[in-house]
């Protein structure tokens, strides 16, 4: 007997609040990605405590970020903000000599209306170091959108595309330095003659190399990445340049690239999981008139290598509470692995930027013959917990605040922040995603095998108890 599956995606919006990790945490991975940068977070002691605890980096390690702590004098306007920030930036230039200083605005600077954008142009002219201002406050932005605001601001500083299509800056430079044929050039890949392609999104260097290699196999050359490892290496942007994102939380950056820099956006699913990576490449290739090759076989090999994990997750259920805006991509991948997704909570949803990802989610659900999960934007945690009590999922992917309470109620949990910091992009890293997902499932199965599944408190001490046979 065949059953008809609803093929429409249901969107809902609840309270309008952001129950997420603080967006200033983007400093933790961006300062490592942009090697010659320095991040100055302008906020209160609370922001400082958060960075100290969340990043786990001690001050004496001299990381390339710092706190400009606001005091009562700053808030009551008794102190000159410009002079205070100037003193700090001069000290940063002297001690660390960065190529760029990035000010990160917080909730406090937003509330007291501190004019960081007005001060930065004058100050960067005085000290001779570029200063970018990114508002990453938790009032307006969710967890990973902190990176989005930084990249959107950085896109404004990218140079204009100067070289004719088909002739790169690297080619012209090599011709000037070596006016004779290079023997090594014979070993290089013959790239197709296509317009410049810039990929935006912060990924570790090894992931950048992996995705570059995947596109190189299709004879596509990546002209640059935003952000680059060094500020001076920011890619050239302009009319005729194609851009494509690797993360679903970069809608503001995409809008800036389209409207301000006149780039052409390639709307594609995101390269998370073998299915997403294949779809990402298949969306890029036709834009340049190239037919994708050998992707189906490559994807099948990856799925075959994941068989041990797939046997463990098949038929298990998962509930996304919403935190890092990776929820749609992760849900699509887990559905393809055979899991059942009850609900996808997400802090913010840009349907235009994630259109291709949503289409792939729908196609995946139809292929796996399961209902399309409903998507709840800005979910109310109380309502979610009520729904979880009814559904009893095997796993909840949630923020840190809810992990222990849910675990105490017998629901396996995984911190969503772990997916943010893990390497989950590309063909080769699908195993890492499943390792994160299956860890709590394996732990619960081991407890079941021991018949020790509950905690009992006696005289202020906890003991594991064996359920009474019925």
From Swiss-Prot:
Q: What is this protein called?
A: Light-independent protochlorophyllide reductase subunit N
Which cofactors are reported in the record for this sequence?
Answer: [4Fe-4S] cluster
Q: Which InterPro entries match?
A: LIPOR_BchN/ChlN, Nase/OxRdtase_comp1, Protochl_reductN
Checking Pfam families in the record gives: Oxidored_nitro
Q: Function, please?
A: Component of the dark-operative protochlorophyllide reductase (DPOR) that uses Mg-ATP and reduced ferredoxin to reduce ring D of protochlorophyllide (Pchlide) to form chlorophyllide a (Chlide). This reaction is light-independent. The NB-protein (ChlN-ChlB) is the catalytic component of the complex.
Among NCBIfam families, the record links this protein to:
DPOR_bchN (TIGR01279), PRK02842.1 (NF002768)
Query: Family per UniProt?
Result: Belongs to the BchN/ChlN family.
**HAMAP family linked to this entry:** ChlN_BchN
The top EC class is oxidoreductase
Query: Which Gene Ontology MF annotations are present?
Result: 4 iron, 4 sulfur cluster binding; ATP binding; metal ion binding; oxidoreductase activity, acting on iron-sulfur proteins as donors; oxidoreductase activity, acting on the CH-CH group of donors, iron-sulfur protein as acceptor
Its localization reads: Plastid, Chloroplast
Q: Which residues cross the membrane?
A: none
According to UniProt, the reaction catalysed is: chlorophyllide a + oxidized 2[4Fe-4S]-[ferredoxin] + 2 ADP + 2 phosphate = protochlorophyllide a + reduced 2[4Fe-4S]-[ferredoxin] + 2 ATP + 2 H2O
EC number, UniProt record: 1.3.7.7
Its GO CC terms? chloroplast
- Keywords for this entry? 4Fe-4S, ATP-binding, Chlorophyll biosynthesis, Chloroplast, Iron, Iron-sulfur, Metal-binding, Nucleotide-binding, Oxidoreductase, Photosynthesis, Plastid
Pathway in which this enzyme or protein is active: Porphyrin-containing compound metabolism; chlorophyll biosynthesis (light-independent)
The UniProt note on the cofactor reads as follows: Binds 1 [4Fe-4S] cluster per heterodimer. The cluster is bound at the heterodimer interface by residues from both subunits.
Quaternary arrangement and interactors, per the entry?
Protochlorophyllide reductase is composed of three subunits; ChlL, ChlN and ChlB. Forms a heterotetramer of two ChlB and two ChlN subunits.
Protein's GO biological process:
light-independent chlorophyll biosynthetic process; photosynthesis, dark reaction
Q: Kindly list the positions annotated as binding [4Fe-4S] cluster.
A: 22, 47, 107
- Taxonomic source organism: Pinus koraiensis (Korean pine)
Q: Which SUPFAM superfamilies match?
A: Helical backbone' metal receptor
